[in-house]
Amino acid sequence: MITLKQALSLSQDELETLKNEIDAKVRASDLNAYIKAPSLNGASAKGVPILIKDNISVKGWEITCSSKILEGYVAPYHASVMENLHQNSMAGFGLSNMDEFAMGSTTESSCYGITKNPRDKNRVPGGSSGGSAAAVAGGLAVAALGSDTGGSIRQPASYCGCVGLKPTYGRVSRYGLIAYCSSFDQIGPITQNVEDASILFDAISGYDSKDSTSANLKPTQTFKNLNRDKRFKIAVLMDHIKDASNEVQLAYENTLKALKEMGHEIVEKKMLDSHYQISIYYIISMAEASSNLARFDGVRYGRRAQNIKDLKELYLKSRSEGFGDEVKRRIMLGNFVLSSGYYDAYYLKAQQMRLIIKEQYNKIFEEVDLIFTPVAPTSAHLFNYHASPLEMYLSDIYTIGANLSGLPALSLPVAKDPLGLPIGMQFIAKAFDEQSLLDVSYALEQELDLKLD
């Protein structure tokens, strides 16, 4: 597939030809990365076609978050990132499959069915932005937008062999993003390479008065300033890879060796055990999800239950029929931790621990430029692999720290396991220092020259 950098130099006629080619490929593909052929929606404007995750509002398109409960809901306005794309010669072209309401790590919970990993169709593409990553890796999209709440851009990028960037919280407007966890959610790019990630990130970044959490900063110019010659002080976290598979640990060590040979300084630092971060993340995210999803009741928009006798039954049937099992589980757990008698023991304590984690990251970044970790404990696994939801939650162990602290992080493919499956590694930077993430990744990408096709 042509890269984003290359596509931006095409004429409008050439772009129309490209869109027709993408549409034909999507119709012929069995990955189920798109919800439907992109031509059925049409493009949101003239420009380079960008795949959009199904939780980002595109005016006039049916946006469902891959959930039955939003069946028939047509977005009445553009998300701010869509307006930004249009101003930068890009346009939405197709909606990507995802875990329902972005709650999952495998893209198995979508009402549209599972998405397959293009590297091995018997395996998951990761999630929740699995459709975006599978499409980019499978040659079905030039580039894509995803959302990242606890690793939902970076983990599927790692599983599929793409570059995935989660920007600093507030760097990219969330206006028009259908919320899962408002204090963690962030929109970001999934692309074929670091240059494309930089270009797409620059296009969607910047202050937005419609988002109260938006940082008052101008759009970034990371692509213009990409520098592969910078050298950084990079921290690795002690005992941090003990939960990773042997293949991931080997890729981690080999990448560290490459970074040292490139002239970067590697130092060891210690943080709170990552298993605590899992507990903190899920308590807070489920609590916020239970609040955010309370609006989906069958009254104002989306699916409405039939043959009901009163308002209470309308609420109960619409929500029980419309939500999938994982979403129901998180809503129930979220309501539990917010309930009387449990708020202080769970939610309040989790928020206090979140502050401690942010302070630990800030302390580390007083002495280093970047932190280096795996993205996921394993490469992509087979479908129906997790015996319990808890096992799936643990797959986020390396990614959630950046969301808890609001820091930017990037997933870069660095190796292949013995089965030929991609393995990604992650860089985390201090707040609003996406430039360093992209610089070090750009240099490492060229140094490794990993061929995944």
UniProtKB/Swiss-Prot annotation:
The keyword Ligase applies. It is an enzyme of class 6 (ligase). InterPro entries: Amidase, Amidase_CS, Amidase_dom, AS_sf, GatA. It catalyses: L-glutamyl-tRNA(Gln) + L-glutamine + ATP + H2O = L-glutaminyl-tRNA(Gln) + L-glutamate + ADP + phosphate + H(+). The active site is at residues 53, 128, 152. Allows the formation of correctly charged Gln-tRNA(Gln) through the transamidation of misacylated Glu-tRNA(Gln) in organisms which lack glutaminyl-tRNA synthetase. The reaction takes place in the presence of glutamine and ATP through an activated gamma-phospho-Glu-tRNA(Gln). This is Glutamyl-tRNA(Gln) amidotransferase subunit A. It comes from Helicobacter pylori (strain ATCC 700392 / 26695) (Campylobacter pylori). The gene is gatA.
